[in-house]
Amino acid sequence: MLIIIRPSGEIALKSPRSRRNFEHTLANNIRSVIKEGKIWRSQGVLFLEVNDDNKNIEELSKVFGIASFSPVMSIKSYNNNLEDIINKAKEVFAEIVKGKIFSVRAKRIGSHNFTSLDVQRKVGEALYPFSRGVNLENPEVEVFIEIRNDVAYFYHKIIKGPKGLPVGVAGKTVVLFSGGIDSPVATWMMMKRGSIPVILNFNLGGSVHRKFVLEELSVLRKWSGGHKLKLFIVNGTDVLIKLSQIEKRNRVVMLKRVMYKVAERLCDKANAKSITTGESLSQVSSQTMTNLYVTEYGIKYPIFRPLIGFDKEEIVELARKIGTYEYSIKLPEYCAISTKARTSVELDEVLKDEENLNIDYEKVLENSEVIEI
């Protein structure tokens, strides 16, 4: 089976050097997902040749960096002869257009003694007797012929990919992963921009919390382009015991700040250059502008919040698409540790609490459980 893979449009806009790097990473990710076959680059697309019984082909729809792909039939060295293309088109498409209204779409790369319009007209005439008619605007079936120099490719399916950038081209980011609806979506969105997520989870719910986090990451692993996901599970109960020493209204923001501080140490350890969270502006009390400022104050790494402008309905819709929603919805909101959280915490208070608590963030990270998924 031969498959033509079209990279995301934005990859084509890169400089020649960056484009080669992105396409090389995409090819490696595809190899990791498909697990067998031959792949090569040619004139802005990738070709993948695999056994006909390969069951991993549908996984290409979850490989970031792919705009679309199509299983194709091809003929080589047709000597610039349109008649050869017409005959092959009849062989490939006659059953597909049978009894249906159809259209032919053609495009070419290279020098030929015919135009793309010639191909559409001649192939359309040849297929017409098998069909119920032609409609270029609203066909029941579209058939495609793509001529690249001396090779013609025939296909009738264009399967959409997730677009974005190949996972790995943007380096690593440490993701604060609670396991709720938001953090898996934020993780997915950072992978879509080419980042490899390093997952940091503060376990506040014991074995149940751990179980659902692992299930969510198993879903996200299918979108990772073959990259393994490394999970660091911190014992959040010990942190909560510490936080019981400070004023209730400040505890939620302080908990988030502890998470950021541990994430900062993990960035150092994992060679990650950013921290990612599922925070959305003003969604809950800890996510007001003031509290976000206090939470991230003094953190040396950039903090990405890919959901910052999303409302909850939009986030839920994405979670359903990704496949994490069914697990996220079963988890309690473990981070809601105070019913009277303030929407505007004073920075001086938090810094004073932080000094008094004297948490050893390095030790918190050292005592974490590490799992590779």
From Swiss-Prot:
- Keyword entries, A-Z: ATP-binding, Cytoplasm, Nucleotide-binding, RNA-binding, Thiamine biosynthesis, Transferase, tRNA-binding
Single GO BP term: thiamine diphosphate biosynthetic process
What is the purpose of this protein? Catalyzes the ATP-dependent transfer of a sulfur to tRNA to produce 4-thiouridine in position 8 of tRNAs, which functions as a near-UV photosensor. Also catalyzes the transfer of sulfur to the sulfur carrier protein ThiS, forming ThiS-thiocarboxylate. This is a step in the synthesis of thiazole, in the thiamine biosynthesis pathway. The sulfur is donated as persulfide by IscS.
The UniProt annotation places ATP binding at L176, F177, N201, F202, K256, G278, Q287
Source species of the chain: Saccharolobus islandicus (strain M.14.25 / Kamchatka #1)
Q: Highest taxon of the source?
A: Archaea
Known catalytic reactions: [ThiI sulfur-carrier protein]-S-sulfanyl-L-cysteine + a uridine in tRNA + 2 reduced [2Fe-2S]-[ferredoxin] + ATP + H(+) = [ThiI sulfur-carrier protein]-L-cysteine + a 4-thiouridine in tRNA + 2 oxidized [2Fe-2S]-[ferredoxin] + AMP + diphosphate; [ThiS sulfur-carrier protein]-C-terminal Gly-Gly-AMP + S-sulfanyl-L-cysteinyl-[cysteine desulfurase] + AH2 = [ThiS sulfur-carrier protein]-C-terminal-Gly-aminoethanethioate + L-cysteinyl-[cysteine desulfurase] + A + AMP + 2 H(+)
The EC number(s) this enzyme carries: 2.8.1.4
Coiled-coil annotation: which residues?
none
Reply yes or no: does the keyword Cell cycle apply: no
PROSITE patterns cross-referenced by the UniProt entry: THUMP (PS51165)
Q: What is this protein called?
A: Probable tRNA sulfurtransferase
Coarsely, its chief localization is cytoplasm
Q: Name one GO molecular function term.
A: CCA tRNA nucleotidyltransferase activity
Give all residue intervals belonging to the THUMP domain: 54-158
